[in-house]
Amino acid sequence: MKKQPRSLLALAIFCSVMLQGRDSQALDRQVPGQYPTINAAIAIANDGDRILVSPGTYQEFVDYEGKSLEIIGVDGPEFTFLDGAGSFLSVVKMESISTSCRLSGFTVQNGFGVSCGEPLSLCGGGLIVIDSVSTIDNCMFLENSSSRGGGVHSENSNITISDCVFLNNFASQGGGLSVEGGSCTISQSQCLENLSYGWGGGFFAGGESQINVLDCDFLQNSGESGGGFFMSMANGSFSQCLIEGNFATDEGGGGLFEQFSNFEVSGLQVLGNIADDGGGLGVTHFSDLNIVDSTISGNTANHDGGGIYNFETFSTFARLRVTDNSAAHQGGGLFLRILGDPRVENCLILNNHATDSGGGVACVEGVSALFLHCTIDSNSTYGKGGGIRAELLANPTIVNSIIWRNDATREAGLSEGPLADFNLIHVLMQGADPEEPLVFQKDAELDDFGYPGECSAAIDEGTDDYPGLPVTDIDGVLRPQGLRRDLGAHEALGYGHCFLRGDCNGNLSLDISDALTVLGYLFNSEDTDGCVDACDFQDDGFVTITDAIQIISLLFQDGPSPAAPYPLPGPDVNLNNSQPDSCWILGD
């Protein structure tokens, strides 16, 4: 038998690879070059064919007829239009396509939807996808309308959307896009200026659908609830999305997760949204969310929860920056309500305002929130609880946190209302009760962004003895950086607790009383008002009578100066001989 030439064998392998994933018999069909209309091309096409559409406006009801086809506007959506002309139909229909189909490169406009089972209900103004596997890319859905899914409605399908724009569409549910059952992955797309009279101005998903949203923008959308988006009995993920300038008359200006929804959420920018409750986000009715590494800023609630409105959930909010939000009633930053135990960790809650109470946070009606390593700073209210307010059987636990520089008519830092109780564990707080063993008031030394300075009293004052403490801070810095965890959302380098060497009584000057304090500490077991490390004039790691003698020598005989920090207060720079634990205010 003769052997095949190697060159022919290689050519055969190359051709096989190039044709892989597409039927070798598939054809490209040109519109209008070969066929006058898209539907004429569909009628004769077979599974796997591509219909390549030249620039122009096509007023057709494009029905894939159950075929696995790619319909492509070859010059893109700027030049290729599928126009429903306001007829009572969707512009495009994909139904019962079990392998895959694709729509790419079109502006789909002026559609009105088709009947979708319920009386007087129309679905998918621009595109309807039913029981199909479909890919939609590089398309714009413009000025379509229907009952569900003004731009696109997907039902019991697996749909992938990328590089698309949903602009100025309208529906009762899901102005830009709605998904009922099945799955939807949407990436690098925009929902802009869509409107819903009901749920989800930009995007609605329900029916236990699986939703994954990546790198998308939801801008200037409006709805009754969930101005930007509304997830109800859905699961999945949202990541790296901009949610800005959306509006809801009820809950969730930026977006609303409700009715047993379960989502992993990260990297959101939720900015300048408005709603009655939950100007930025609403999380309600037994949803379970893990929201991390996001910014919630500049949102407004006409009632409760300027940044986030949390109602009956067990969600986790971690590494969030909740800043500059406002509420007309309670909870400028966060409003946590009713019989849940949300977890708030490594969060910066800064510069929020509520008119009535709880400028930073309000906890009400039996909620048992847990705050771990949070900084609640510079919030305000005209009522009680500039930092945090609890009332009506609420029982928040606050661990390793800072409550500082908040402002209120009464009870500026923390306000405990009727039938409420706080559990405070290692908290630096304005207005701290000196009788509270694990709470203290010293200068947190925070900058305008909530970061502690090198002399902050929050440094090294945290406890490790609490279950489930986060491993890193809000910026991903490992904890601890010193001997113990720092309080608040940020972990700082060093050991904090600046002092003046030789200032044994902590009055920030070196005088004869410091020598007497050393002697009292050594011979009468008296406490020092400063930290013991400051009493160690020689910085040799021990407090002895020599330290008292050297203080006297410096004062009266022009003797040698003490070791650093001197002559100005600062942190200990010699960690070999330091006793930073002697400066701790709170025990373990």
State the predicted function of each range.
Residues 61, 65-69, 135, 156-165, ...:
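Predominantly extracellular beta-rich ligand-binding scaffolds that present long acidic/polar faces
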Residues 435-491:
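C-terminal accessory segments
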